[in-house]
Structures are given as C-alpha cells and as structure tokens.
Amino acid sequence: MPDMGVFLLATQAVAPPGELLNLALNAGAIAPEGAVLVAMLATLLVDLAGEQAAARWVPPICYAGLGTALVLLAQQWNAPLEPSFLGAFLADNLAISFRAVVALSTLLSLLISWRYAEQSGTPIGEYAAILLAATLGAMLLCGSTDLVSVFVSLETLSVASYLLAGYMKRDARSSEAALKYLLVGSAAAAVFLYGASLLYGLSGTTSLQAIGLALLTSPTPLAALSLVFVLATVAFKIAAVPFHQWTPDVYEGSPTPVVAFLSVGSKAAGFALALRLLVGCFGAFDNQWKLLFTVLAVLSMTLGNVVALAQTSMKRMLAYSSIGQAGFVMIGLVCGTEDGFAAMVLYMAAYLFMNLGAFACIILFSIRTGSDRISDYAGLYQKDPLITLGLSLCLLSLGGIPPMLGFFGKIYLFFAGWADHQYLLVVVGLVTSVVSIYYYISVIKMMVVKEPKEASDVVKSYPSIKWSTIGMPPLRIALVGCVVVTAVGGILSNPLFQWANNAVAGTPLLQEAIALGSQRSIG
C-alpha cells in the first residue's frame, strides 16, 4: 500500500512513531470548535422558548462559547503537535492564530449585531446560530490538513455565509446578494472539487502533506492544472481580482454585521487555506503559484483602491477597500520568508480591529439615520463626536497613517517584500496606499471640515446623543474596544510582531517551506 507509506512519511514530522491512537483521534485539538458547537446548539434550544427568552439568553451563551474557545486556543499555544482524526486536522501555531482571529471577529460581529437585529426585527437566535456555524466552519478550515476536511469545512462556512447574506428576507437586496453569492460560491466549490480530484488521482491520498511529497517527486502537467483550479477557489474566498465580482454586491445587500464578519473572519480562513494548500501541496510549483499570486496582488491592490474612489456608499467603498487590503496581505504570501509569513499574520490581526471598528461606526450611524451614503456623513462631528473620532482613526489605520496599528502592519509587509526582492509588489503597494489614503481622508474631511450650514439633512435631523461609560451597550463596547486597539496597537507593534513570529516558528509546514526556499535561492 504505497499511499499509506506516503501518509506515514508525511506525518512523522509532527507525530512520534507509535502514537497511532493519538493520530487517529486526539479530539482535544478541536476543543475550541467544540465550545463553539455547544454554544450554537444551546442557542437553537433557547430560541425554541420564544423571542423574549432568546433576547435574554442568546448573547451570554454566545459570549461564553466564544470566550471559552479563545481560552482553549491560548492553552494550545506552543503545545506538542499531534495530528487529529487520521491527520485531517493539525492545531499548530498558524492554525491557532487564524482561529483566534476568526473567533474574535465573530465575537465583535455579535457585539455590533444585537442592536441592529433588534431594530430590523430579526430573530437573534437563528441569526446567532448561523453565524456560529460559519465560525465553526472557518475555524476548522484554518487547521484542516486533508482534502476531505478542507472541503467539508469550506462548505460549512460557505453555506452558512449564504444564509447570513440573505437573512433579511424582506429586503430584496439581501435576497439578491444571497443568490449571487450562492451561484458564484457553488461554481468555486465545483472548481475546487475538480482540482482536488486531480490531486487525489495523481497522489493516491487526500493528505495535503502526502500530496506535497508526491508532487515534489513527480510533478506533472495535470498537477499544474489542479493548481489553477485550487488557486481560483482560494482567490474567490479572499476576494482577489479577478474573482471579486461578487464582493461589492454581496457587501452592499447583506446585513451590515454579516458584512463585518465576511470581511474579516471569512477572509482570514481564506488566507489560512491558501497557506495550507499552496505552501503545503504545491512546493514543486513554488515559482508558478507565486507568479500567479503576484499578478493577483497587483490587480487587487490597483483595482480595489482605484474603484473605491468612485463609490458613494460606505459599504461598497469598504468592499473595494477589502479587495485592496487582500492584495497587501498577498505580499507576505508571495515572499515565502519568515518575515513575510509573520507580517501576513500580523496584518490580519490588525485588520480585524480596524475594519470591524469602522463597521461598528457605520452600523451605529445607520441605526440612527437609516443611511449608508457617504455624503450623509457631512458635518457629523457636530452631533456625534465619538463616531467621528472612531471612524476617523479606523480609516486612517486602514490607509496606513502612523502611528496607527495599520501603518506598522503595512510597514512590516513592505519590508518583507523589499528584503525578498519583490520590488514590483512593494512599489504598487506604496502607490495604491496613497490612493487609498485619498478616499479615506475624503470621508474624514466630509465629517469634520464641513461648516454647520453645509451639514447634510440627515445630520441636521440626527438624534441627540448622551454618552456614558456606565452600562455601555454592546455596540459601543465593540466600537470603543476596536478604536482603542487600533490607536494604541501601533505602540505595541513589536510584541505583536513577536507573537506573529512565534506563530510562524511553531508551524512545521512554514518552516519547511522557508528552508526549501532558502536552498533554492542558494542553489
């Protein structure tokens, strides 16, 4: 049985010989996902008791489940690596980092969801359960090391995301967004399955490590074709150009808290998938997939930031902004160095807070005004200084203005790219960062510079606001927390980068890829 021999060879790097029982199960590796699953089931049971019981008990159940998951993830950090479920899942530091980003994005998305759901008349029990299901799929995807577990996790995330996008059934735009997302996502899933079938046919196994070993020993044109199919699926999940067409329409039509989760949690899972598949499986085609991702990164940074200039809707502007941000993260992926991977992890953590902070401000503004138009923010500083300050800081961080957290995230990415001689990516990144600063600053100027007589009609009729730190509602807690981390995180960038370096150092997959890349550069 040659495939079993390849399988054992692939798993010896992470599991001592003879520990086949741990290799077969080791269910403790998915204990954080178990906490999320228990919270999801409890949410569904509470929802059966009625809307009043759900409104009272669903939020604390979600907080408890996600909080427990984060604690369990912290306990797994730097723990001995033991593959789970016959090598289908591995809780290395890379998986822990991305799973933590996903869990935190869900927690913050829920904090900014309750008020929105209450005003729109959305049943929060069903909504929270579906969001937790998407979280479960995304977290499992971050640690999946087998084609079967990758596909099951990917579809769990995708199906839950389709339901979330169309959750506002009375809104035609939400239904349209869900339909578009479903059609494009189904096509991406079919393409992935075709690529996975080619990989299985070429290697005789579904283990990603074993597939990587098989392709290293005998690369074939069919393997290159499977690379194209897999890369298309990854590009769809991270909304890279030219696989981005669904993003603006889905972001505009979906409920805003759902967009917040899709822009961070789903994207983080997509980049974790990219690392597992491209670095783990296609080491034999390292130059080819890096060239393709270089093209995707240049297109994403350019189109995402240029088209965002013309947007009049805040959600559409942030949709195109997220496409550009994905291009920045791809710089670290293309580098394939320790600094590149670490900068990639750091920027995803920074993006979590600055993007969700911006969405928290947008949701609070839309709840009070019912508007999403950028022009309606004119003169907002007169009526709501906190939203103005919070949104301004988050947008400045997204643009890479010092001393915000986003500035240091981009600097680390650009330094890693320059050190790896990725001059084209760095130059395009710098130019498009300047372009992004223009449309971010234009929103800030709209809010701050306008005279009282030039304020929009929406702001003129803005309700009076009384801020108090005592008994702050969840939406304001999320807003203040994200803004504080975004503003102060730049000061703590060195410890954060050390954490990101530890994530890379504790991941054998990335260390092997770095060593292989060094050998090729020397040779």
Curated annotation (Swiss-Prot):
EC number: 7.1.1.-
Family matches, as HAMAP family: NDH1_NuoN_1 (MF_00445)
GO cellular component: plasma membrane-derived thylakoid membrane
Keyword Plastid part of the UniProt annotation: no
Main location: membrane
GO MF term list: NADH dehydrogenase (ubiquinone) activity; quinone binding
Range of residues in the leader sequence: none
Species of the source: Prochlorococcus marinus (strain MIT 9313)
Quaternary state and interactors: NDH-1 can be composed of about 15 different subunits; different subcomplexes with different compositions have been identified which probably have different functions.
Reactions catalysed according to its record: a plastoquinone + NADH + (n+1) H(+)(in) = a plastoquinol + NAD(+) + n H(+)(out); a plastoquinone + NADPH + (n+1) H(+)(in) = a plastoquinol + NADP(+) + n H(+)(out)
Protein name: NAD(P)H-quinone oxidoreductase subunit 2
Transmembrane segments: 29-49, 57-77, 94-114, 123-143, 147-167, 182-202, 223-243, 255-275, 291-311, 317-337, 345-365, 389-409, 424-444, 477-497
Biological process, per Gene Ontology: ATP synthesis coupled electron transport; photosynthesis, light reaction
Similarity annotation: Belongs to the complex I subunit 2 family.
Enzyme class: translocase
Pfam families: Proton_antipo_M
Function: NDH-1 shuttles electrons from an unknown electron donor, via FMN and iron-sulfur (Fe-S) centers, to quinones in the respiratory and/or the photosynthetic chain. The immediate electron acceptor for the enzyme in this species is believed to be plastoquinone. Couples the redox reaction to proton translocation, and thus conserves the redox energy in a proton gradient. Cyanobacterial NDH-1 also plays a role in inorganic carbon-concentration.
Membrane topology: Multi-pass membrane protein
